[in-house]
Amino acid sequence: ADAWTDDAMLGAGFSGAWAELRESYRLPADFIQLVRDFAQQFIQTEKRIEPENVPIQQELDTQTTRLKWIQTSPMDVISVCVDSVLAMPLRARNQDPLVYPDIVIMAENNKAGFEIVKRLGNKGIKVKHTFGHSGDGKDKELSRKQKMSFFIGSEQVKATTIHSFKGWESTCLLVHISKASSATDFAAIYTALTRLKASEYGYDSYLTVVCSAPELAEYGKTWSA
């Protein structure tokens, strides 16, 4: 029940219908090429399904995607995630009402996610999360209940794992990456990137990636090219 993938996704494949992004009605138009670039570089050809078409209505929109890729060290990755969450509302334009409850944190694993939540709490930022009491994965029943109520009436920052966010999407994401060495890792990262959606109200979308995996450093540089 805790698996992030359907049977069709086993082996890092993308044959399941949920991952078919050839017509990208939810991805921001100005982000699609970066997603395609990631897929072409890191996903096996026979497993790859890329977003291709940009709907006409998105082409005409004035909204932009505010992208930030932060390459950092394993020692600093958690603190950089925390600082990035705190800075997110400051990046919004005056006409874009971005507030903390809009932010979704997607952590690579429960342990890292719980540490991010704890440090944000120390700074006065409340977070609704799915990491249980300690992030060690042992209190599965509590974690299950947290997942059931994740988006119900939450006026807080939200945090979960990449694996648990399947089926959801958000206009404001922070993604934590520390591992990028296997096909499964790359599939999970692709999943995380494609959880970003365009705002239906014409506001900007926000995606910050905090990465300590050296394998992605060169790709990350293309976000600011």
How would you name each of these model-derived features?
Residues A1-A225:
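Conserved helicase motor core of SF1/SF2 NTP-dependent helicases
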